[in-house]
């Protein structure tokens, strides 16, 4: 029999389902031993909850498809995002639908005690895997920011897959064996089959909260704190147009390396690298222009000195081929004039003067075009040798810039996870140690649980909003577009020189000038 009414203890409309009965000799005989009534809450609640489930499943499936099908997303961070999306899919496919039915039935469990244990185990598995995946992602971002050049050597596909496997093994150990613990430590929770209550064992709640949330949360905050410090230092260097380099000092037979801040002394080496079309306030760079292939303008290092001896082959095509720039002597400020472009084929450019030695070596890159008014200036003294594979370093710097752009999106994902799950992992231990502290414990538990579940729906929305690569991938998948090759502004071998971050200054186009000031 169905009856519609209003629960006196709740504001929601409900539908009451009662078992069929028969009357014999003024005696009521129930046809089943199930609970006498199931209160179904308002249908709009069901529509809302199952819409959340559908969005969660669809969004995370889209993330998995995007990373698997788009080459530009298949990187170590992309594999971690797939692992995170799988954890969110578990929430959307198993945990959220069962919890939705539990809410719609007005907190009446319909699936039996065994499925209640499976429900809690899958919930713990997914939430633990999510935060540990985010922890690995944050450590990955920290390593990429600390050592962008050596990052690709340290973080391989095999190591990332091993880290992902470790995350899931840890999550499974914490969740499914916990069923035995729950039944042993909390047998009173299994007396009523219409209820699905989580264990109140203080030891398990404390241990699981520590491993599932607080330890990875500490590692995440530590890693992103370091990332923030590194990014702040680099952004300051970019605004100043200065890059810190390592200085090697030799005292007799012993040699030690010291890294010093360029901003602290005028006698320390300063490297400025500029490209773009914006105006430069400095008069020494105003008329400088460097053409690298077709689209990138790069103003290379400037070195002021008295004399320049170039032992190179001069051609009439006014180009510079594969320069090997080597300054062997530092010098005082003076001007260098050039009336035409020159061609150096694997030769040295020797800067001679009476100052302390300065050495700069760049391995031979591809063909470039150097305009007649371009300058190369590096302040003296600099006593170090840097041998760089410029093509490879340029590619690595392109990846680094791309990864740093992705780091912002991932930091938002981490922030959303912390905001969504912190209430649950604060409330659950409190209720285990102080049952009388909350008068409406069931309502609060429902709220904090669904706040955590909503995080699984938010992640794909964050990707589509803050990640240009994911937004493009989602658009291509949903509209059945073929992947188009993306043009990049960093295609020249010397587009990014000298590792890590550089000073970027834009300059307006100026007519060629035959002299350098």
From Swiss-Prot:
Tissue: Expressed in pharyngeal neurons I1 and I2, neurons ASG, AVL, CAN, PQR, vulva, intestine, rectal glands and rectal epithelial glands. Also expressed in neurons in ray 8 in males.
SUPFAM superfamilies: Family A G protein-coupled receptor-like
Membrane-spanning segments: 47-67, 78-98, 109-129, 160-180, 210-230, 410-430, 443-463
Gene Ontology BP annotations: adenylate cyclase-activating dopamine receptor signaling pathway; adenylate cyclase-inhibiting serotonin receptor signaling pathway; chemical synaptic transmission; G protein-coupled receptor signaling pathway; G protein-coupled receptor signaling pathway, coupled to cyclic nucleotide second messenger
Keyword match Glycoprotein: yes
Primary site of residence: membrane
Annotated spans, Disordered: 309-339
Gene3D superfamilies named among the record's database cross-references: Rhodopsin 7-helix transmembrane proteins
Membrane topology (Extracellular): 1-46, 99-108, 181-209, 431-442
Protein topology in the membrane: Multi-pass membrane protein
InterPro entries assigned to the protein according to its UniProt record, in alphabetical order: GPCR_Rhodpsn (IPR000276), GPCR_Rhodpsn_7TM (IPR017452)
Cysteine disulfide links: none
SMART domains xrefs: 7TM_GPCR_Srsx (SM01381)
Subcellular location field: Cell membrane
MF annotations from Gene Ontology: dopamine neurotransmitter receptor activity; G protein-coupled serotonin receptor activity; neurotransmitter receptor activity
Sugar attachment sites: 25, 106
GO cellular component labels: dendrite; plasma membrane; postsynaptic membrane
Keyword Transmembrane helix in record: yes
Keywords linked to the UniProt accession: Cell membrane, G-protein coupled receptor, Glycoprotein, Membrane, Receptor, Transducer, Transmembrane, Transmembrane helix
One Pfam family here: 7tm_1
Cytoplasmic side: 68-77, 130-159, 231-409, 464-517
Function, as annotated: Receptor for dopamine. The activity of this receptor is mediated by G proteins which activate adenylyl cyclase. In terms of antagonist responses, would be classed with the D1-like dopamine receptor group.
Family as reported in the entry's similarity comment: Belongs to the G-protein coupled receptor 1 family.
Protein's UniProt name: Dopamine receptor 4
Species annotation: Caenorhabditis elegans
Name of the gene encoding the protein in the UniProt record: dop-4
């Amino acid at each position: 029999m169905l009856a519609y009414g209003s629960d006196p203890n709740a504001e929601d409309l409900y539908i009451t389902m009662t078992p069929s009965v028969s009357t014999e000799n003024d005696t009521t005989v129930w046809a089943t031993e199930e609970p006498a009534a199931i209160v179904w809450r308002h249908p709009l609640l069901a529509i809302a909850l199952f819409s959340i489930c559908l969005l969660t499943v669809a969004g995370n499936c889209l993330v998995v498809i995007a990373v698997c099908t788009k080459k530009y997303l298949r990187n170590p961070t992309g594999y971690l995002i797939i692992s995170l999306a799988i954890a969110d899919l578990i929430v959307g496919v198993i945990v959220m639908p069962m919890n939705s039915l539990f809410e719609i039935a007005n907190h009446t469990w319909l699936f039996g005690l065994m499925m209640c244990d499976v429900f809690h185990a899958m919930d713990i598995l997914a939430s633990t895997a999510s935060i540990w995946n985010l922890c690995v992602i944050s450590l990955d971002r920290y390593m990429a920011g600390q050592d962008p050049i050596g990052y690709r050597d340290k973080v391989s596909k095999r190591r990332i897959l091993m880290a992902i496997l470790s995350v899931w093994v840890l999550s499974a150990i914490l969740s499914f064996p916990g069923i035995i613990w729950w039944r042993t430590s909390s047998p009173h929770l299994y007396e009523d089959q219409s209820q699905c209550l989580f264990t109140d064992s203080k030891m398990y709640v404390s241990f699981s909260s520590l491993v599932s949330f607080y330890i990875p949360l500490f590692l995440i905050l530590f890693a992103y704190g370091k990332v923030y410090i590194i990014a702040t230092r680099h952004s300051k260097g970019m605004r100043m147009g200065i890059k810190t380099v390592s200085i090697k000092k030799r005292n007799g037979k012993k040699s030690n390396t010291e890294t010093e801040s360029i901003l602290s002394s005028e006698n320390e080496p300063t490297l400025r690298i500029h490209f773009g079309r914006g105006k430069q306030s400095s008069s020494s760079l105003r008329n400088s222009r460097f053409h690298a292939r077709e689209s990138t303008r790069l103003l290379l290092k400037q070195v002021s000195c008295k004399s320049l001896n170039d032992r190179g082959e001069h051609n009439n095509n006014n180009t510079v081929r594969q320069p090997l720039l080597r300054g062997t002597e530092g010098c005082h400020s003076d001007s260098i004039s050039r009336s035409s472009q020159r061609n150096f084929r694997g030769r040295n450019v020797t800067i001679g003067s009476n100052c302390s030695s300065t050495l700069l070596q760049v391995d031979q890159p591809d063909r470039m075009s150097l305009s007649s008014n371009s300058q190369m200036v590096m302040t003296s003294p600099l006593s170090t040798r840097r041998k760089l594979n410029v093509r490879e370093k340029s590619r690595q710097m392109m990846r680094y810039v791309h990864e740093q752009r992705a780091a912002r999106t991932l930091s938002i994902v981490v922030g959303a996870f912390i905001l969504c799950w912190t209430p649950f992992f604060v409330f659950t231990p409190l209720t285990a140690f102080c049952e009388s502290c909350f008068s409406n414990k069931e309502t609060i538990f429902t709220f904090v649980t669904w706040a955590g579940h909503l995080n699984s729906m938010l992640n794909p929305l964050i990707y589509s909003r803050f990640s240009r690569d994911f937004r493009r991938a989602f658009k291509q998948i949903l509209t059945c577009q073929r992947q188009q090759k993306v043009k990049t502004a960093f295609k020249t071998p010397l587009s990014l020189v000298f590792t890590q971050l550089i000073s970027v200054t834009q300059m307006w186009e100026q007519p060629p000038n035959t002299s350098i000031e």
